[in-house]
Amino acid sequence: MPCAGVLDSQSDRMVIDPDAWSVERRVVARDLLDAGDARGAYAVLVRDEPASDTDKVESHMLAGFIALRAMGDGKTAHRHFSTVLSEATIPGTTSRALYWQGRSLEALGDLRSARVAYEKAARHVTSYYGQVARARIGLQELPIRSLPNPTATDRATFGARLSVRAIDLLYRADQKELALPLVGALAGDLKSPGEVVLLGALTQRYKDPRATLVVGKAGLNNGFAVDALAYPTGGIPRFQPVPGSIETPVVHAIARQESAFNPKAVSHANARGLLQLLPTTAAKTARNAGVSFDAKRLTSDAAFNAQLGAAHLGELARAYNDSYPMVFAAYNAGSSRVTQWIQRYGDPRRPDTDPVDWVERIPFAETRNYVQRVMENTQIYRTRLNGRTALMIDRDMGQRSGDRTAGR
């Protein structure tokens, strides 16, 4: 691979955009890994010198993964994951680094330290790697934290904010689109968990799940226990599932990631509505389900969109024997891509393929992130919607399981 040699010799200090160069390094490293050249892939990454924290994290995570899972070098891998942990500022990155620290320590035979790393990761209950870590050490529950109680000071400070008054006036005027950016700006600035709860309550009062989600995400990123706000349950209207539809928590999980609960969303690829369905896919699903189809309803009728999305996801679940990483990857990137990845990386439904590894090997960053986000969303929504705290991510990740159709 000629470009690999260039990347191996080029110092990023000499290039105009080291972050763009870093992205190219990771692409080439993955190509080399797919070709069986793990050491060449690692060599490309160790010379990486990105400027942004995000690219530093991604570069070290991939280098550590290659060192651990392809080269069997737990010590080197642990060093990379420790670097990521020192740079981590949000729960998702922290739990990711801690989980892989645990895996590298396991490989080194230090089981006690590995468990400590997993236990630390497991505290981040809303993150994919926090949930995977919980399952790895046998924690079978996924507790959703109660919202903090706002203090009298929180209420006084919040009520005196001009931005709060402006948001309330916009809601009263039925101007949710104008209120949303103001909500987002305020949510990012709030330093008190009590005020975050009050802002979330304001958005809920006006039945605006999009804004509630924005508030909840900002709160989680600031380390506040606002799980219920970050996973709103009012974004999907009641709908009649057709036989064989996927479980309702997955519908919420997908909509949260696909459209952030915007029923009128239309992507550059013409995917439409809450679950971002392509009209051709939706029409085929409707035909299979015996439902009359009208493409305009994908953005005008949220319940119709949810019904067809649930039915299509049910079709994918049957095709992949309930392997949710495969289902979600196919929903995002297409079934033909999943077929390619099975050929390259193995079948995550089989015991000889680690489904966590399989997800990490997905070559598209967007799809890799998508699968992990929808997986974590699903675990939380099972608790939010069904009142169940049992963690089922191990079952979801790979091996065949029981019925998970709507209503179960």
Language model features with spans:
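Long, internal scaffold/assembly segments composed of regular secondary structure
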Residues: 6-7, 16, 170, 187
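C-terminal, active-site-flanking charged/polar segments
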Residues: 122-140
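Terminal intrinsically disordered/low-complexity segments used for targeting and assembly
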Residues: 137-149, 400, 404
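Helix-turn-helix repeat elements of alpha-solenoid scaffolds
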Residues: 1-7, 31-43, 68-82, 137-144, ...
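Catalytic glycan-binding domains that act on GlcNAc-containing polysaccharides
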Residues: 12-21, 26-28, 35-63, 72-76, ...
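Long hydrophobic segments that form regular secondary structure
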Residues: 165-193
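Acidic, serine/threonine-rich low-complexity intrinsically disordered linkers/hinges in large eukaryotic
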Residues: 145-175, 392
